[in-house]
Every structure is written in structure tokens, then in C-alpha cells.
Amino acid sequence: MQVKRIVVLLLLGVLIGAMPFANAQESEIPLATIVNDEGGPVNVTGEVAYTSGFFTLGVDEPLIILEDQAGFVDRDRGFLMSEASQVIGKITSDFYTSPFTYSLDLPIEPAGSLRDVDQDGDSDTGVMIYAVAYWTNVWGDAFLEERDLYGGGWSAAYASTHIDQNPSSGYEVIGGKYIVYAPDDQQGFPSGFGEDDKLFTDDDPIVRLPAGYTLVDMDTDPFTFDRSKNPVIPLIEGEGAAQDDFSNLSYSEAFDEMIEMFRKNYAFTELKGIDWDEKKATFRPLFEEAEANEDYLAYVNAIRDFIWSIPDGHLFAPYDDTEFFNAISGGLGMSLRELDDGRVIVSYLLEDGPAEIAGIELKAEIVTLNGKPIDEAISENVPWSSPFSSTEVRRLQQLRYVIRFPLDSEVEVGYQNPGDSDVATVTMKTVEEFDSFRFSSFNIGLTGFENPVEFELLDNGYAYVKIYSFSDSERLTIQLWERMIQLLNDNGIPGLIIDMRQNGGGSGFLADQMAAYFFDEPLVLGNSATYDKSLDAFYSDPDVEQRYFLPPVNQRYNGVITVLIGPNCNSACEFFSYNMTLQDRAAIVGQYATGGLGGGQTTFAMPEGLVLQYSVSRPLDAEGNIIIEDTGVAPTVKVPVNEETVFAEGDVVLEAAIAYLDENAG
């Protein structure tokens, strides 16, 4: 026992002897130089300015939160901040008007992740590091879960931090402001980026923080440590999210900037074989002429013609409404369809319209138009709905616009009525009628009053759901979607028909995660490549693959599924449809492929208040191949386009889907 007592005393002596040495080590870390020492932040206010044309799209529940930065400290893209750490602020002005303002009260005892960042090799308590960040809440309760957080990590835009926007950088923090909480006055924190210009690395210079909250301004060298009671922290949109703005330039100067922007950032230059020098030589004179003549309409038409020259259906071309109306207001009272066998026939005939009065019958084959073979006339037409990614969609729109003319135009049509052996020719004058134009519209039947998701139980026992948009209210969309899934499971519905035929797209992430309700594995869906200034090349970050984040097991549906597609399924709609082809999860049913709009979009501003969009990211599958763009998603169950299907009374695509379910959902 005596020996033990001596040993214990010796150990105690060692520990007591070591304690002054440890305190001496801590004291060797210099104290941070504090400005505005009012005891530390209590409330933070600021404003959030945004220029992106998509910032508010689909947003119902915008949030300003304290964002735990442990994910960045660890360089962990999958880091999920806990609910307890999510201190939610108040938005204090109109969110839909930029800039909006916020106010955030700091908790007395925060619950973020502690990280030891003093780089001394010892294990210390560490500090809690926060950014102020904007998020939107879509799933679940008032806090952000994995899907709201896009799988985790840290904010790259609309935060108090300034992020390196080059995709190859790993989205390093390169400036901005942190709010740091130290549980005592013995914790170290960087006072600069060090020689490697990176934060939280071995070469960081370290200072010791006072206990409590300190605002760290990383835009100064060394960092500024501010203990103001009520600091003001604006959130940074970030170069990658901000809209390029050429609106204050002359027409020709704005065109030059636009061309250079397209040259570097446009996602499909090689895929589509675009020569930007050639486009500059072709279109710059139009902008110069419009500028010299101060001719606004000529300027708009120059932009229109430039955009129309790029075969990308995501691009929007402005045009003069009066010119458009004058060009298409004259109709012949008929619509056209092209059959699989190559014939172009009359699919709609207006009663007492010019075509019917002239003797043209329903199902008549149109052979010539204004003296040209119908195929040539169609191919030469430039639809007002241009441009297009898909040649198939362009052809369908050419069929629609080839028989639209100015009012009172004389039009010669060569046709062959059903049962006739000869081709007849007739000259008609166009009248102001839009029934035939509406009949051929991809959006026929839409009223604008549709919910983003509408579903019903069919008489045959299958469920039918139509997704109209991925750009409507995201929270409402998910609530309706999960309500449907619950009903499917509660009632043991064996088959589901998902109608995507009139969906213009929206959030690709929302589309991906809605498809996840039909899977049991967190599949990797692919990636995207964007322009990286530091590399002067497009780059795809392997650490940010797109994947399913699975809903709870009771919110998954395992029945047989068919997806109805068509040429008016665009962008995010196409990604949903593509996702449903993985593991052969659904049969894709349709007469045509989807629209072929695969690029990720951003907006830019031109003179005269014009805001346009263009494709800046390439969609890639899990193997790195470009998907969707130009080709779309093709049907796996192809419904023919022939006289029988064109003139069928019912919905032939829906009927084909039901037939598939009858064979496979028994």
C-alpha cells in the first residue's frame, strides 16, 4: 500500500508540475486584437441582394440560419448540420424584392459542432464556427434535413462567406465573415489564410479568442476580430450565382460581352459545333446598325436572330409581339400531322374555314404548299417558338407554323383527299382564326389553374398522376406528392401512370428527389460540368455527384410504373423521366422523345431591360457521358403515329400505358 501511495503521489506531482507548463503553452498563442469590444454579437442583421433570375423560383419557405461550418473545416461535402445547431432568423422585408433584409438573434448557448482549429497538434475543446446563410425549406418540419441541404456540406452562395467559385477549387472559403463561438478564452483561431491561401490548414497563423461570440472578418489581412453587439452582415451572392449584367453598355458593346460569355461558358459549343467567331461576324453588324439608328426593334430582332441561330431549346429569344401577331394571325382553318410513313395529313379542319370551303377534307394528304413540295416547305420554315435542341421537336413546330401567314395572304395548297387518285390544287386566302393554331399547340388544354401535381384513381384500379411543373411551389409539390404516395401504399394500388407530357421543367434537384420515392437504393444519377476559370476548361467535380437521397421506407412506392412522355416534357421533366429508366424502374410510353433540353441555366441582362438565359452546365451520366441534350429521353414503349392513332377518340398514349400495366402489374 505504501508503494502505491508513493506512486500516486509521484503521478500527482508530475501532473501538478505539468500544469504550469501547459498554461504557458496556451499563453504563447497571442490574443486576438479586438475591435468594437461590446461583449460580442447578440443580434445580427443584414441584407441579401440577388440578381439571379431563378432565385425565388418555387420558393415557399425561405430561411436565414446560422450555418454550422464544421463541414468546411473537415472538407466534408456530406456534412449534415444538426437541427439543434440551426438557429433560424427572421426575414424582415419582402423576400421577392431584392435586396431583402433579415435579423437573427444568437443563442446564449449554441449547439453547433466544436472544431479544434489552432493547428498545434494537441486535442483542445475547439470553437463553433458559423456562417450566416440563406436556405429554403421544402421537406419535413421547420428545420433543414438532408434533402433540403442538397446532401450536406456548406453554402457556396448567398452566405456571409466568399467562396472560390471554380469547381476544381473544392469551394474553398476565400473571404467574408464568420461568427465564431469560443466556450472559454483558451481556444485558438486563424488570423489569416497562411502561405497556402487556405483556411484551417497547418500554416494558419493563430490567435486566441475571448470567450463567447466574435465576428471574424476574413476580407482583411490579418483578419479583423469584432465584438460589436449588433453587427451588420450582408450575404454574398457569389460570382457563380450572380447574373452577368451588360445592361449599361451600348448595343454593340453588350453583344461583344455576350459573345465572349458564350464562348467561355456555354456548355455545348463542341457538341453543337458552334463557331463563335462566325456568329460574331454574322450578327455584330445587326447590332451596330441598330445602335447607329437608335432602333430598338432592330436591336430586339438582332438578339432574336442570334438566339435562334443556336440550336438550344433552353434559350429564349425576345420578339416584338406585334410582329409576331402579324406574321401568324392568318390561318387556313387546318392543322397538320406527319405520320410515321412520311405523309403529311390534315389532322384538324375548322368548320366553314378556308380549307373546308375549298374542298380539303379531314385526313387529306398535303402534297405541296405555295408551289414547293410539302417536305421542303416544312424544312425551310423558321418557327416563332425557336430555337430547339431536338430536330424532332423542331419538325413538329415547323408543321405548326408552316401554315400560319399574315392575314389576307393568298396560299396555294396541293392536296389529295381520302379516296382520290389525283392531287388537286387550290388557292385560298387566310382569315383571322386561331382554333387550328391552338389545336396544334403542345399546351392544348392547359388553363394555368393546374396544381403542380394532380392525381386520381382510375376506374381500372390504377392511379394516374400528372406533374405539370417542377418550378411551382416546391413545398406544395412535395406535400401533394407524399400524399399521393401514402394513398398508393394505404390502398395497395398495383400500378401508377405518371403523365409528364406537359411539363416545362424547373428544379432538376426537385425532379431527382421526387423520382427517389420509387427506389430503395441511393443511386448515383450523374454529375454536371461547368466552366472553370482557373483551368480554362469545363470541369466536373467528382465529390458532388448527383444522387438520390431516399425518403423514409414508408414513403416509397414499389408498384409497377409507366411514365408518359412527349415533346413538351422539357428540362427537369426529362431528368425525372431519365431517372425512371434506371434499373428499368418504369416503362417510358410515348409517340415522341422528350424535348432534349439538358443544360443547366443561368440568366444575363442586356440593354433595354432584357433578361435572357443560356446553358452553362453539361449533364453527365454516371459514366461521364452527356445526356438529355439534343436527344431527350426516348420511349421504351413506342406508340405509332398513323391515321388510327391520330384520329382515335381516346388518349392513345394513356391507353398504351394501361395495356402495359395490365400485362405487368397483375
Locations of the language-model features?
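Bacterial N-terminal signal peptides
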Residues: L9-A18
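Short, well-structured beta-strand/strand-turn elements
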Residues: L315, N570, Q583-L597
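Active-site-proximal beta-strand/loop segments in catalytic clefts of secreted hydrolases
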Residues: L349-L350, L369-N370, K466-F470, D499-N503, ...
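Bacterial N-terminal signal peptides that target proteins for export
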Residues: M1-V7
